[in-house]
Amino acid sequence: MLEKIIKQKKEEVKTLVLPVEQPFEKRSFKEALASPNRFIGLIAEVKKASPSKGLIKEDFVPVQIAKDYEAAKADAISVLTDTPFFQGENSYLSDVKRAVSIPVLRKDFIDSLQVEESRRIGADAILLIGEVLDPLHLHELYLEAGEKGMDVLVEVHDASTLEQILKVFTPDILGVNNRNLKTFETSVKQTEQIASLVPKESLLVSESGIGSLEHLTFVNEHGARAVLIGESLMRQTSQRKAIHALFRE
């Protein structure tokens, strides 16, 4: 599935026209996660669908969802902008950015031109996936994003990918995706297995498969300072109540 998505992205980039410059306030994604509202930082995701699960939320109003997340003290918001596989739109991110006061992460499959596009649509941070980009190219995009005033969440799915990246540079923010790319199954033990390789200066984020206070505590005990949660929140009627229930508040 990942290969299929990447192939589609390469086609999209060929015809990409950069949007007009718009004034957006800059917010620090890293600082928000480093000083969270709870014992662990929360990146709450605005996601309508996924390639593995199909449509997740029919009654999908991105701005209202984002406002609910902020009201429930999420530290940052992730917005899916990929259209073919996640039913996202760039406008969702821009609208969310204007509606909330916390940092916004663009979740997509980024190539060079999309780094500038991300800045123009209001992203405070972008996601770069280690399994998609070779380490040198990833580093180039990482530096480019930094020059444009954005933070970068560098995501890996396995230890070997992380080891290759660390030979080139040490990312400020490292995400371990708990989803096995071959089976698409999730396990928070993936964070445990990779955490020992994460440099102390990198802020560790655990992503995918987190749906309980026990999961939050487990990944936090193994070094995660933040989590990214999407589907388990999006499936609930009220995203605000879902966050409070997750933390048993």
Curated annotation (Swiss-Prot):
Keyword match Amino-acid biosynthesis: yes
EC number: 4.1.1.48
Family indicated by similarity: Belongs to the TrpC family.
Organismal lineage: Bacteria, Bacillati, Bacillota, Bacilli, Bacillales
Keyword set, alphabetical order: Amino-acid biosynthesis, Aromatic amino acid biosynthesis, Decarboxylase, Lyase, Tryptophan biosynthesis
NCBIfam families the record matches: PRK00278.2-2, PRK00278.2-4
Record organism: Bacillus subtilis (strain 168)
GO terms classed as biological process: L-tryptophan biosynthetic process
Recorded GO MF terms: indole-3-glycerol-phosphate synthase activity; phosphoribosylanthranilate isomerase activity
Record's catalysed reaction(s): 1-(2-carboxyphenylamino)-1-deoxy-D-ribulose 5-phosphate + H(+) = (1S,2R)-1-C-(indol-3-yl)glycerol 3-phosphate + CO2 + H2O
Pathway, per record: Amino-acid biosynthesis; L-tryptophan biosynthesis; L-tryptophan from chorismate: step 4/5
Name listed for the protein in its UniProt record: Indole-3-glycerol phosphate synthase
